[in-house]
């Protein structure tokens, strides 16, 4: 049997290149690490703190032991229940009196029917946990307080929330809470009396209708919401990160931060950041901006949009009696007992903090159940009712435990299609091929009853995050398809107005970007696991979200290590050599442990004397602003020259005979220019095109230095790699006229910045530059023309030798500028407001000395680069055409001699951002396929925040993105830098701290309500939980913003039906939801793509066609929204006649239009 897609599914994350296992194998679990977690590791404890009574334990799950397995539902049918003992009273001395709240025994005639609980004394840690929960919160404080505690011995993680009760007096029943009801169950109901001292505060209140509609009410009643975090939170969690959906701006004096639950309001008092965005208030961009405003303390403290901060025990049918109200607080604590394995604990910690909104949402659901149970126990004088109320809490705890365990342990889809495309994989061709094979299989085997078109229609209608990915961005479709980066507008927003990227990713997954906001999830039901898994994999192309990149920040004295997957970046503070100011040295190192392949010595040819083989290249995207100390540069140059000498020894004799220049005499010059650095090219404000910021004296000497250096390189055929990949500094002194490397309409200006050092023409550093001039003049011996002649001679010979090389490379070698398609910037009108998956147009390139030399005709262009290889260069609005050309102009003249038959280094070093070339197969031969720096998402404030380009006018350039295809820079000999602590992070495993991968479930044994996508064997559990889950999603939304509707798409592969269940519709006729109306547009989209593939068109082209057809849906929705503008009521027939929109397409187009034109929903929905 031929290997299937899942057998061949990327094995690059499996560690050391082991062959991929069949992901359909249950043991494989889609290559997702399956942790173990037992429900018994979750403990619930409830406290009451009363002004008069002090602190009591109301409930503690750890001290109950069932002696019989009889169902709780049979409790007390005919048995007389006797409950004795009072609540555990916590005394200051630490002693605990009596037993816990209830110790249930049964009369002799009921022993066989009811479960029996054996009472025990309070747990030994009750005092400690109570102090941790209540802390120093004043009794008069009316808000709720959320805390996260990490207990080291035994290892535990506790999530606690303290609430103020809202109790109303009642003359129709007892005012007692659970504690009081348990105390008085035993008494005659006629003698029950209201005791004002037993009025309890509540836990986490329900959302009343008035509270749901009036977010301001919460603020007036409760005041600011705060979070008090225990110190151990920071001590244990080694990589502090925001809790998703929150903004924790800590007050360093008081240790009190904003509530971790603080959320954005649906309507904010802030003006729109751009008048052109006002019409898209429901867009992804606007949601992110609103989130930034309402989670920033600069704008004051905002309340949650709904009131969940108090516990409502009041009985609305009874009148108030404020005379007997006492101040009380209730605390709920959920304690997770961790294992003794430190690695497992770290995994759970990472999962807990990254998925905190889900934990809090389920805690709110647990609180609601406890609240209802307390109300039940208060209303009834019947002892059996109160016991049932107690057991309701146990049932709610059981459900909470099951949900959390399933969320943590269920299998996930190992390689979602869309996220894998987003992550810059070099296997795009293979990925498209596999996707199209699965697509063809499903179209042929799962189209009964139009099942697949109906399912895709439902997914595209509800999971709306695909819309921003197809919106036009002024780029050709091939570029958009290949690079899939983030948008300019959203990328800029992430820098200037940071929001939590995990929150944005979660909203994308649930499709909550339309208006009104809707949460969606998809469940595939089927007994054939193989078929269900293939469909789940296929759906991960349409259910999209942003890809995130996590950055770990560790401090070590004055040094700081910023660790990204696969790399280590260190920053140190260095003193200036000329001026007294200090500057920052930022250095990037390759992560050795994450390398999958090392090039063997045999792959290097004996006569290889190129820089690539001798000194491999660094290839990460990061900016460096530095001027290292003299001794560091000496070490670097010595090492470089040593390598150059070594290359000479193994070079052919005829090459050695041409060595006319002694390497040693350039040692001093190299010290000033051979440091391993990176640069980031960004736009600055426009500067005069005819002026050069760098002084002429800074440039001319390097021209002369280049002559000698070029002669050395051309004679030896060695590429000492003086020019950067992609970006050259094309500015020349005003009096020089050297042909440019690019055909550009307007010559632009390079501006150089150095932290702590002024580089203006009148700077003191000109003295230093002059010293360099004098030094170079002493060694200057030959005119430029002679050097050019020698260089051109070798250039021509190399062109003849390497006719099989890429045409772009030949153009470069011959000194011609590489002409590539030229795309201009999109004007503001065509810029997408939330096109967050398009090009993040930053160009981050290398200025290190390991790329072959440029032809001598362009030598002067490199003067700036050679003079200041360690600077951060900025530029003025360079056209994309230059960047596209420039990224292709990697000079390969030195490398061609090394690999005449299959120049692996050559194929690796030439980036192909505009289309996969045939040489892409070579790329996979050498290099770490799985260790690619991920494309920075628009949501990744982690990566973006480190960037220098934070100005409002920044337009990051698209053509030269150097991240997605940089699998070639794999080998690097790390040189330890003094005073820097290097931290290595391995990124070979799927990241569980990422909603995009953790919420796309595989084939699960049980229904998991939090999963955005999952497969299950039967719908029994789904039918039980669906209604309550949808209601809970609206009442306690994980996104902390009002949700109008929660929907669930149920695709039954046994019955070939697709239904959509909604929180706004009641289930009728034993159906889970409403049947889906198949969109003719979607049906045509699927069939046309299938026909193209059957006609043997390339999988890449078929997927591009699929993207084009999705974009057509967007354009039709724009047309619909424009037609509906200003209208109040439109007939469907009118839309069909005027716009050609069929009635079956209207729900889909209206949903898509709601992402950019909210008024459409008011007219059509």
Curated annotation (Swiss-Prot):
Signal peptide: none
Binding site for Zn(2+) 1: 608, 613, 615
Native source species: Mus musculus
Gene: Fnip1
Protein name as annotated: Folliculin-interacting protein 1
Binding site for Zn(2+) 2: 610, 613
Composition skew (Low complexity), residue ranges: 93-108
Site of covalent link Glycyl lysine isopeptide (Lys-Gly) (interchain with G-Cter in ubiquitin): 1118
The keyword Cytoplasm is assigned to this record: yes
Span list, region Disordered: 92-118, 779-811, 912-970
Record region (Interaction with HSP90AA1): 928-1165
């Amino acid at each position: 049997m031929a290997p299937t897609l899942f057998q061949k599914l990327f094995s690059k994350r499996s560690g050391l290149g082991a062959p991929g296992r069949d992901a359909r194998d249950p043991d494989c679990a889609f290559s997702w690490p399956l942790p173990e977690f037992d429900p018994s590791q979750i403990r619930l404890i409830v406290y009451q703190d009363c002004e008069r009574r002090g602190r009591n334990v109301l409930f503690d799950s750890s001290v109950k032991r069932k002696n019989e397995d009889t169902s709780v539902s049979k409790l007390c049918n005919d048995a007389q229940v006797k409950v004795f003992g009072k609540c555990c009273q916590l005394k200051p001395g630490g002693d605990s009196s009596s037993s816990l709240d209830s110790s249930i025994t049964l009369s002799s005639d009921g022993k066989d029917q009811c479960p029996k609980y054996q009472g025990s004394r309070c747990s030994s840690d009750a005092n400690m946990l109570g102090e941790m929960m209540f802390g120093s919160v004043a009794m008069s404080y009316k808000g709720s307080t959320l805390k996260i505690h990490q207990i080291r011995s035994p290892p535990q993680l506790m999530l606690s929330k303290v609430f103020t009760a809202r109790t109303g007096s009642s003359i129709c029943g007892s005012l007692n809470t659970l504690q009081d009801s348990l105390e008085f169950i035993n008494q005659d109901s006629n003698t029950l009396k209201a005791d004002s001292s037993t009025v309890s505060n509540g836990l986490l209140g329900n959302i009343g209708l008035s509270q749901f509609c009036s977010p301001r009410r919460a603020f007036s009643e409760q005041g600011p919401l705060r979070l008090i975090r225990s110190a151990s939170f920071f001590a244990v969690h080694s990589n502090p990160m925001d809790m998703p959906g929150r903004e924790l701006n800590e007050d360093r004096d008081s240790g009190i931060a904003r509530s971790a639950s603080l959320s954005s309001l649906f309507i904010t008092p802030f003006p729109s950041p751009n008048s052109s965005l006002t019409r898209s208030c429901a867009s992804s961009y606007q949601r992110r901006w609103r989130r930034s405003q309402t989670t920033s303390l600069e704008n004051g403290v905002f309340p949650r949009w709904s009131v969940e901060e108090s516990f409502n025990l009041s009985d609305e049918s009874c009148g108030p009696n404020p005379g007997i109200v006492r101040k009380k607080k209730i605390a709920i604590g959920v304690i997770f007992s961790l294992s003794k394995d430190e690695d497992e604990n770290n995994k759970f910690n990472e999962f807990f903090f990254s998925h905190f909104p889900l934990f809090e949402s389920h805690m709110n659901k647990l609180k609601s159940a406890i609240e209802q149970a307390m109300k039940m126990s208060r209303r009834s004088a019947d002892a059996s009712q109160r016991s049932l109320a107690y057991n309701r809490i146990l049932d709610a705890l059981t459900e909470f435990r099951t949900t959390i365990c399933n969320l943590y342990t269920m299998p996930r889809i190992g390689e979602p299609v869309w996220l894998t495309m987003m992550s810059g994989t070099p296997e795009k061709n293979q990925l498209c091929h596999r996707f199209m094979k699965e697509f063809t299989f499903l179209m042929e085997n799962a189209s009964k009853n139009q099942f697949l078109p109906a399912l895709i229609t439902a997914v595209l209608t509800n999971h709306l995050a695909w819309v921003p990915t197809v919106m036009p961005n002024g780029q050709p479709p091939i570029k958009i398809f290949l690079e899939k980066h983030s948008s300019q507008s959203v990328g800029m927003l992430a820098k200037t107005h940071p929001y939590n990227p995990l929150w944005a990713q979660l909203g994308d997954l649930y499709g909550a970007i339309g208006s009104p906001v809707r949460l969606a999830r998809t469940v595939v039901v089927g007994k054939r696991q193989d078929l269900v898994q293939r469909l789940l994999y296929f759906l991960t192309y349409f259910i999209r979200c942003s890809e995130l990149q996590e950055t770990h920040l560790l401090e070590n004295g004055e040094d700081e290590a910023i660790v990204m997957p696969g790399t280590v970046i260190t920053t140190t503070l260095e003193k200036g050599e000329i001026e007294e100011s200090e500057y920052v040295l930022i250095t990037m190192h390759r992560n050795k442990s994450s390398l999958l392949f090392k090039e063997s010595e045999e792959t290097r040819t004996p006569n290889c004397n190129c820089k690539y083989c001798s000194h491999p290249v660094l290839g990460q995207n990061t900016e460096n602003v530095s001027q290292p100390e003299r001794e560091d540069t000496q070490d670097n140059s010595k090492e470089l020259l040593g390598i150059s000498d070594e290359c000479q020894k193994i070079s052919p004799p005829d090459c050695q005979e041409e060595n006319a220049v002694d390497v040693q005499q350039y040692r001093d010059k190299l010290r000033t220019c051979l440091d391993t650095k990176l640069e980031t090219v960004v736009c600055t404000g426009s500067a005069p095109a005819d002026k050069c910021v760098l002084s002429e004296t800074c440039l001319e000497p390097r021209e002369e230095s280049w002559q000698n250096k070029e002669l050395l390189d051309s004679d030896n055929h060695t590429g000492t790699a003086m020019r950067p990949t992609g970006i050259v500094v094309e500015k020349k002194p005003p009096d020089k006229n050297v042909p440019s490397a690019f055909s550009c309409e307007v010559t632009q200006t390079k501006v150089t910045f150095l932290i702590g050092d002024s580089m203006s023409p009148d700077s003191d550093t000109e003295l230093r530059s002059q010293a360099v001039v004098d030094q170079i003049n002493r060694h200057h011996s030959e005119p430029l023309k002679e050097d050019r002649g020698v260089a051109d001679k070798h250039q021509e010979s190399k062109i003849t030798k390497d006719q099989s090389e890429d045409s772009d490379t030949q153009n470069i070698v011959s000194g011609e500028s590489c002409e590539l398609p030229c795309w201009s910037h999109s004007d503001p009108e065509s810029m997408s407001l939330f096109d967050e998956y398009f090009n993040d147009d930053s160009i981050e390139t290398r200025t290190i000395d390991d790329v072959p030399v440029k032809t001598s005709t362009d030598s002067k262009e490199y003067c700036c680069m050679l003079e200041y290889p360690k600077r951060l260069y900025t530029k003025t609005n360079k056209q994309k055409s230059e960047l596209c050309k420039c990224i292709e102009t990697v000079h390969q003249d030195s490398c061609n001699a090394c690999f005449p038959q299959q120049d692996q280094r050559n194929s690796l070093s030439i980036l192909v951002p505009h289309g996969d070339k045939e040489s892409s197969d070579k790329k996979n031969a050498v290099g770490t396929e799985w260790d690619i720096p991920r494309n920075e998402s628009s949501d990744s404030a982690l990566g973006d925040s480190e960037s220098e380009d934070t100005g409002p006018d920044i337009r990051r350039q698209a053509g030269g993105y150097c991240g997605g295809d940089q699998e070639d820079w794999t080998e690097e000999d790390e040189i330890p830098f003094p005073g820097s602590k290097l931290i290595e992070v391995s990124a070979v495993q799927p990241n569980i701290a990422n909603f995009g991968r953790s919420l796309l479930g595989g084939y699960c044994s049980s229904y998991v309500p939090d999963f955005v996508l999952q497969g299950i064997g039967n719908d029994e559990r789904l039918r039980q939980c669906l209604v309550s889950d949808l209601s809970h999603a609206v009442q306690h939304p994980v996104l902390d913003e009002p949700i109008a509707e929660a929907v669930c798409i149920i695709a039954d592969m046994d019955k070939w039906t697709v239904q959509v269940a909604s929180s706004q519709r009641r289930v009728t006729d034993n159906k889970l939801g409403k049947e889906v109306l198949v969109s003719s547009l979607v049906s045509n989209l699927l069939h046309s793509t299938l026909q193209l593939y059957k006609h043997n068109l390339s999988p890449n082209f078929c997927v591009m066609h699929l993207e084009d057809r999705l974009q057509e849906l967007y354009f039709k929705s724009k047309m619909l929204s424009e037609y509906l503008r200003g209208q109040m009521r439109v007939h469907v027939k009118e839309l069909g006649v005027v716009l050609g929109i069929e009635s079956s397409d209207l729900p889909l187009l209206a949903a898509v239009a709601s992402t950019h034109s909210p008024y459409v929903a008011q007219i059509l929905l």
